[in-house]
Swiss-Prot record:
GO molecular function: ubiquitin-like ligase-substrate adaptor activity
Intervals holding WD repeats: 138-178, 182-220, 250-289, 338-375
Subunit structure: Component of the DCX(DCAF12) E3 ubiquitin ligase complex, at least composed of CUL4 (CUL4A or CUL4B), DDB1, DCAF12 and RBX1.
Listed PANTHER family: DDB1- AND CUL4-ASSOCIATED FACTOR 12 (PTHR19860:SF10), DDB1- AND CUL4-ASSOCIATED FACTOR 12-RELATED (PTHR19860)
Subcellular location as annotated: Cytoplasm; Cytoplasm, Cytoskeleton, Microtubule organizing center, Centrosome; Nucleus
UniProt source species: Macaca fascicularis (Crab-eating macaque)
Protein name: DDB1- and CUL4-associated factor 12
Domain of life: Eukaryota
């Protein structure tokens, strides 16, 4: 029996009017088209919207952090200096940015001033006196610390008496109050632990806790409204704690630097006897621990890196990194390669730690790579040739030096004195670095200030 041939040709689609089968096929074709064009259903849930926004913000934040980190890595090699002329002021010890164009500074000659980085204009700010200003004026100390509270509405610094704490209101710099009954020696460092509470560290080995209450602020406003002469309150300390004293050298237990960890409410303190102290700092000060530093000479600066949960301590030639959660023998230290001049200032910005030295150098340490940033090869005409692999180092300008009797008798045969970087600070954008200081020898009178951008 012969097999019936089967055609492999497809049948032509039926016309629209060909009956129910044709309608089914046509319906099937439309359904296929519909399936191809179908989009995900729109979720109108508030929870879904918030989660989607959170993911988007996380991506944007991650990208922003990468961008800021890259900028922090590349910026130091691009910075150029512009010096400011400060007249006859002596050694800038402290500085903070007030806004995008103003920096407030304190000097060894006890002068508080604001410099406009765009116009170079200098404006001096009246310093605040004790309620009983009959004490002997202390020479050679000055203003060692300036700190802004977290909301940037109050500024804390030293007073006319370097043992006292002075509080100003921002942005007007109107006086608010003076804490003048706490320390018996100079204030070396200040740290805000909240918007209204600050801690001062003194050369007498004590730490004072001060509170600027709403009552003090209200009365300050009322006084300013009725008087054109600056009037301010006088406050007393809320707590006064002595740091532990080493038996072998009790006279050198001077609180030199403070740094606050806002996440854990912990306050780090460095004393000149070579110890790091950690305190719980909320409504009072409670000691948590004390540990001997691996390099214990000239420990004069301290900074806290919140992202890395470590404190950076400067010494005569090293920067040491302390994590209070780790044993003391795990402390890592790096050498600045400028022995003898000392680390005078230190700060965190992103993953870069900026180090200011007594030789007028700025060094940049990458905490992720655990090494200093290095020079790039430069082929610019007329520039000093630099070897690849050398640490990137920026050097401060000439500044001003008073050729007084001390200079004539002891230093006149020396052609040039580097300006120690006693203070430096980045602006909010991280693209401008204010640097200031003066000659390292205590007997020399001079100053330096510059904007690196």
């Amino acid at each position: 029996m012969a097999r019936k041939a089967v055609s492999r040709k497809r049948k032509a689609p039926a016309s629209p009017g060909a009956g129910s089968d044709a309608q089914g096929q046509q319906f099937g074709w439309d359904h296929t088209l519909h399936k191809r064009k179908r989009l995900p259903p729109v979720k109108r849930s508030l929870v879904y919207y918030l989660k989607n926004r959170e993911v988007r913000l996380q991506n944007e934040t991650s990208y922003s952090r990468v961008l800021h980190g890259y900028a922090a890595q590349q910026l130091p090699s691009l910075l150029k200096e512009r010096e400011f002329h400060l007249g006859t002021l002596n050694k800038v010890f402290a500085s903070q940015w007030l806004n995008h164009r103003q920096v407030v500074c304190g000097t060894k000659c006890n002068t508080l001033f604001v410099v406009d980085v765009q116009t170079s204009q200098i404006t001096k700010i009246p310093i605040l006196k004790d309620r009983e200003p009959g004490g002997v004026t202390q020479q050679g100390c000055g203003i060692h610390a300036i700190e802004l509270n977290p909301s940037r509405t109050l500024l804390a610094t030293g007073g006319d008496n370097p043992n006292s704490l002075a509080i100003y209101r921002l942005p007007t710099l109107d006086p608010v109050c003076v804490g003048d009954d706490g320390h018996k020696d100079w204030i070396f460092s200040i740290a805000w632990i909240s918007d209204t509470m600050a801690v001062s560290g003194s050369r007498d080995g004590s730490m004072g806790l001060w509170e600027v209450t709403d009552d003090v602020l209200t009365k300050s406003d009322a006084r300013h409204n009725v008087s054109r002469v600056p009037v301010y309150a006088h406050i007393t300390h809320k707590a006064l704690k002595d740091i532990p004293k080493e038996d072998t050298n009790p006279d050198n237990c001077k609180v030199r630097a403070l740094a606050f960890n806002s996440k854990n409410k912990e306050l780090g303190a460095v004393s000149l006897d070579g110890y790091f102290h950690l305190w719980k700092a909320e409504n009072t000060l409670s000691k948590l621990l004390s540990t001997k530093l691996p390099y214990c000479r000239e420990n004069v600066c301290l900074a806290y890196g919140s992202e890395w949960s470590v404190y950076a301590v400067g010494s005569q030639a090293h920067v040491s990194f302390l994590d209070p959660r780790q044993p003391s023998y795990n402390v890592k230290s790096v050498c600045s390669r400028e022995r003898g001049s000392g680390i005078r200032s230190v700060s965190f910005y992103e993953h870069i730690i900026t180090v200011g030295t007594g030789q007028g150098s700025l060094l940049f340490y990458d905490i992720r790579a655990q090494r200093f940033l290095e020079e790039r090869l430069s082929a610019c005409y007329g520039s000093k040739p630099r070897l690849a692999g050398e640490n990137l180092k920026l050097t401060t300008g000439k500044g001003w030096l008073n050729h007084d009797e001390t200079w004539r008798n002891y230093f006149s045969d020396i052609d040039f004195f580097p300006n120690a970087v006693y203070t430096h600070c980045y602006d909010s954008s991280g693209t401008k670095l204010f640097v200031a200081g003066g000659p390292l020898p205590s007997g020399l009178h001079g100053n330096y200030a510059g904007l690196w951008s």
